[in-house]
């Protein structure tokens, strides 16, 4: 049962996007009202499901082993497994690839409809999905910042998937410290055209044979650049030159110097690249060139970075889902030991054992909580673009910015924990590579590392997002949790609301403690940043899960116990109860630790780490 059998289920996905989120509000916006009704998403989801089941997941076996092969050479350094070609072409031809990122297209889909498509694709093959998702992010930067001439030159073939795209940020000496990039760009006699010289590493989809050209977005500094991130520029550097008419030209002196041998996502080509080894690499500046050594590259790249951080959470969500469904399938079949309540009885399927049920419901609750967080954030992002009222657009943009680090860090952290629980459900077989959870655990670990490690996300959340615009957006974010707890109480969920009320009081104390530390001992904010991000995530996920449970209870009452959907809604209610009563209490532990404010990790001499 290697991860080549697609077990994903769509019922909760459709509940989230069709029943729970206010899709009528979004689809009434000018961008969508003449094109889509709420049921139109079914066709996209159903086609995507078939592609995932019949094409992507079967191809995933070769994605993991043998994966991509590095052969070197200037023109084609990486060979992908043969089955990748059909998978890549099928996705692009079905309109399920980089086309999503074209926000200027007439009749474009909402981003919140993209979320389940990416989730299911990642759940089918975490490796293969990277080949078109990085292209989509690169398109976003070009679309929003480049000249019309450059858009016309590059975007059509990138959107179609004929050309791929990358984000050329990381260097051997510049990982999280982006401002340390050493790659240089030298102006030429042609305005906007620069000669490129430098090295990049860990470049996802840096070279492959699925696209005829790779368009790299490269961060680089001019010789007179200001130090740090303010001196960074972003340039379009194609592997093969692109002529003015959009045709492909000669090799542009972009060399693949090696492929990384990774723990997971073996089917994703992660490369080291060298630009200008022969002094003949050129790229186009995106937007205006630098002024007095100050570039706009970081601001431009962060448009792609924020998109990819949200997508990273969605990729992690796919691994959570596939690992859970693999564990569930196994636990329904595996027979071992009598029930605890009938020790002399026959052996039963392990799903009947208490601790196995706990592990399964933990995974299910994490899957549904993280899905609610992700989809809500995509929904906010859509409204930040498409709502008619400027004040409303600003509000939803603020909410999106606050939640992106939660989506990236919390979901990817929980993917690692949840896939571990899936392995545990399988017992010794979970440790065997022929079973899906082992590969999914290896594959999902990257998500807490790339697009800014999860501590970077925690820094961003606690030091930027909570204080932006004098803290007003964060106050509104907290207030919407308070408003929900004050106005939505239901006697059927009295215990859950009581738990959330207590956790919310604790979270407010966490926030006030953090603000006091900011003034008196900011190093403590760094020390507790990750735990505070998790506390915020548990609070918002608890609220979202309880909101879904209220809707599920209402639907169940309307439909009755005999309805075919009754078990789904009962599962929604039980899963929300579990999350609120078993996961949300983690907020109390964070507050207790913050009250103690233990600084052992800071105080211990380096020499004592032995």
UniProtKB/Swiss-Prot annotation:
Entry's induction text: Highly expressed during syntrophic growth with butyrate (at protein level). Seems to be constitutively expressed.
Biochemical pathway: Lipid metabolism; butanoate metabolism
Protein name in UniProt: Butyryl-CoA dehydrogenase Swol_1933
EC number: 1.3.8.1
Catalytic activity, reaction form: butanoyl-CoA + oxidized [electron-transfer flavoprotein] + H(+) = (2E)-butenoyl-CoA + reduced [electron-transfer flavoprotein]; a short-chain 2,3-saturated fatty acyl-CoA + oxidized [electron-transfer flavoprotein] + H(+) = a short-chain (2E)-enoyl-CoA + reduced [electron-transfer flavoprotein]
Cited function: Involved in syntrophic growth of S.wolfei with butyrate, as part of the butyrate oxidation pathway. Catalyzes the oxidation of butanoyl-CoA to crotonyl-CoA. Probably passes the electrons released by this reaction on to electron-transfer flavoproteins (EtfAB) to finally generate hydrogen and/or formate.
InterPro entries (alphabetical): Acyl-CoA_dh-like_C_dom, Acyl-CoA_Oxase/DH_mid-dom, Acyl-CoA_Oxase/DH_mid-dom_sf, AcylCo_DH-like_C, AcylCo_DH/oxidase_C, AcylCoA_DH/ox_N_sf, AcylCoA_DH/oxidase_NM_dom_sf, Diverse_Acyl-CoA_DH
GO biological process, one term: butyrate metabolic process
Cellular compartment(s): Cytoplasm
Species name: Syntrophomonas wolfei subsp. wolfei (strain DSM 2245B / Goettingen)
Active-site annotation: 451
A Pfam entry, by short name: Acyl-CoA_dh_M
Cofactor: FAD
Keyword tags: Cytoplasm, FAD, Fatty acid metabolism, Flavoprotein, Lipid metabolism, Oxidoreductase
Family matches, as Gene3D superfamilies: Acyl-CoA dehydrogenase/oxidase, N-terminal domain, Butyryl-CoA Dehydrogenase, subunit A, domain 2, Butyryl-CoA Dehydrogenase, subunit A, domain 3
PANTHER family (UniProt xref): ACYL-COA DEHYDROGENASE, BROAD-SPECIFICITY LINEAR ACYL-COA DEHYDROGENASE FADE5
